Amino acid sequence: MYINYLKDLISFKSVTPKSDGAIEYINDLLKQHGFKTEIKIFGDSKSEQVTNLYAVFGSNEPNICFVGHVDVVLEGNHELWHNASPFKVSQQDGKIYGRGAVDMKGAIACFLAASLDFIKNNTDFKGSISFLLTSDEEGKAKHGTKEMLQYIYDQGYKINFAIVGEPTCEKEIGDAIKIGRRGSVNFKLNIEGLSGHVAYPHKANNPLPCLIIILNELTNIKLDEGTEFFQRSNLEVTNIEVSNNTSNVIPASTEASFNIRFNNLHSAETLAKQVEEIIKQHCKEYKVDYKLEYSSSAESFIQNPSDKIKEFAKVVEHTLKIKPEFSTSGGTSDARFVKNYCPLVEFGLLSETAHKINEYTKISDLQKLYDVYYNFLMEIL
């Protein structure tokens, strides 16, 4: 059934933060199979409204919750997709093409099938199975999983263990389980000089040499050596702007943006202080003014492998005959919100085609993921 569920889910044009009916489809399906469901819409305005779902079968502990998102990134040029439509499934050579196939409608489809089959085959299991789904993970992630978790806990629900269905595997299903994530902090630096004619540099103060020196130092600084579970923190320049289209004018100002992906040796605040010390030193030397702004969407985190995390890893190994590696690579995810409530793993399909034109998953990979999810429910419940 996971193939049918996936095809149905891909057909919804759920570009973040819209559900486009995807969450309602899942809600109806789960309700038909005895789940207690609730849809909540959060958001400050109509354009920011986010659809969220919590559905639970059973009332006993442990509550095993699948956490995911139905929203997808923009599809790009339709003409480059199979069938010229990213929301019309194309099935070829054992693969299913469509936006969201791996990120992450495929994982949702597999856990839907696994949980419904498990409930059908095990009428007296000891715990609960639940879903927490949102339509806002790829975007601002402001009114999605974070807000929904707070809501369900206020209602008296408790999650004992979560599976976040992000596409975590690298080369084959089962090679990686994420137990943490790097943090992310964005910087915007504005340097104010004094404009003038290029023939009279002594009557101006060009902000660009200062910016070049600063960016050179920042991009060459070694923030750390990495840790057991984390790679080195890295800084990447993402944009440089100079509002000057005239070749004989020294610009008055310049602006640069950069991002740091950091491990658990840092926080956004400590990195901001380190960055500003470098900026302050060079701006003083060049006698220019600066303004530095920064914002962080996620701090880094790492979990000590709990008993349930270890059990999940054993299920992966026994099911797929591959020993998974505990990993923290990749970008940010909603796991950063879930970890405040319960232990978790992130485990899903291959990440290779996520967000790309002709995103696809192999049907054989869907079967493997289904098997892991089903076997874990059998083991834990």
From Swiss-Prot:
Zn(2+) 1 binds at H69, D103, E166. Keywords: Amino-acid biosynthesis, Cobalt, Diaminopimelate biosynthesis, Hydrolase, Lysine biosynthesis, Metal-binding, Zinc. NCBIfam families: dapE_proteo, PRK13009.1. InterPro entries: ArgE/DapE_CS, Bact_exopeptidase_dim_dom, DapE_proteobac, Peptidase_M20, Peptidase_M20_dimer, Peptidase_M20A. Transmembrane segments: none annotated. Its cofactor is Zn(2+); Co(2+). Zn(2+) 2 binds at D103, E138, H355. Its EC number is 3.5.1.18. It holds the Pfam family M20_dimer. Gene3D superfamilies: 3.30.70.360, Zn peptidases (3.40.630.10). One of its GO terms (molecular function) is acetylornithine deacetylase activity. The active site is at D71, E137. Pathway: Amino-acid biosynthesis; L-lysine biosynthesis via DAP pathway; LL-2,6-diaminopimelate from (S)-tetrahydrodipicolinate (succinylase route): step 3/3. Homodimer. Coiled coil: none annotated. Catalyzes the hydrolysis of N-succinyl-L,L-diaminopimelic acid (SDAP), forming succinate and LL-2,6-diaminopimelate (DAP), an intermediate involved in the bacterial biosynthesis of lysine and meso-diaminopimelic acid, an essential component of bacterial cell walls. This is Succinyl-diaminopimelate desuccinylase. The keyword Nuclease does not apply. It catalyses: N-succinyl-(2S,6S)-2,6-diaminopimelate + H2O = (2S,6S)-2,6-diaminopimelate + succinate. Binds 2 Zn(2+) or Co(2+) ions per subunit. The keyword Nucleus does not apply. Belongs to the peptidase M20A family. DapE subfamily. GO terms for biological process: diaminopimelate biosynthetic process; L-arginine biosynthetic process; lysine biosynthetic process via diaminopimelate.
